[in-house]
A protein has these predicted regions:
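Conserved ATP-binding/catalytic motifs of P-loop helicase motor domains
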Residues: 1-238
Length: 238
């Protein structure tokens, strides 16, 4: 995959290559769009740091585009269908919804850490819509929803990759289609975490338990969380 189309600076291109090398060692070859099934035993963490304006968010967005093009499944915080264990997957995270919204405005389907640690339980009737939007089933017929409502849901999901937003566009409330939340038990594959300067040790440990490959994007000039004694979680990562 050529970097020329990305319009990255030399520093960004170096960081891209570093991340691509880590991903290749984890079985995701971005140069050749080749994917190897994940290995449960292999764990890796990387930190890509730079001050505000250095282009971390653009770099994250381009890495997301490359993984998506290679065929990696994208994990959405507001819906997760059945996954094959041999499929590679990526979750893009931020500590707060505000930070996740910045990425979503760039077309990057980001979610919050909380939405990954806890997964929603869908009402079976409305889960049919989610499965259809996610591409795993045919278009359903749902009592009380018109074809126009389903079209709005489809258009919204294609534009923003938000399942909750798509169902809201169809005229549903969260309390209609989400019946509860449960703590995640099964592991995930790859994660990109933006605004890693806001991450505390407990969140970092939780994410390392869930993900086999974790890439942090952070600003060393920001203030650390109040319970971190001035230290960033990525300070000790090489």
């Amino acid at each position: 995959m050529s970097l020329n189309q990305f319009h990255l600076s030399s520093d960004q291109a170096d960081a891209y290559d570093t991340a691509a090398q880590l991903l290749k060692s984890a079985g995701v070859d971005l140069d050749n769009d080749l994917l190897v099934p994940p290995k449960d035993s292999k764990k890796s963490v990387m930190a890509l740091v730079g001050k505000a304006g250095s282009g971390k968010t653009l770099l994250l967005a381009k890495l997301y585009e490359a993984l998506s093009q290679a065929g990696v499944d994208i994990i959405l915080g507001d819906y997760e269908g059945k996954r094959r264990r041999d499929k590679r997957s990526l979750a893009i995270l931020a500590p707060t919804n505000k930070a996740a919204s910045v990425l979503r405005m760039r077309g990057v389907p980001a979610t919050t850490i909380h939405r990954i640690l806890y997964t929603p339980v869908y009402d079976p009737e409305y889960e049919k819509i989610a499965e259809w939007l996610a591409g795993s089933s045919d278009k359903p017929t749902v009592e009380g929803l018109t074809e126009e409502a389903l079209r709005r849901a489809y258009d919204f999901f294609q534009a923003y990759k938000s399942m909750a937003g798509a169902l809201a566009a169809a005229g549903l409330r969260g309390s209609d289609f989400i019946t509860g939340w449960k703590r995640r038990e099964e592991p995930l594959d790859i994660a990109f975490l933006d605004e890693a300067s806001m991450l505390d040790d407990r969140q970092f440990e939780d994410l390392q338990q869930i993900f086999s490959t974790l890439i942090l994007f952070g600003d060393p000039a920001q203030l650390a969380p109040v319970n971190q004694s001035g230290a960033m979680v990525f300070d000790g990562i090489k």
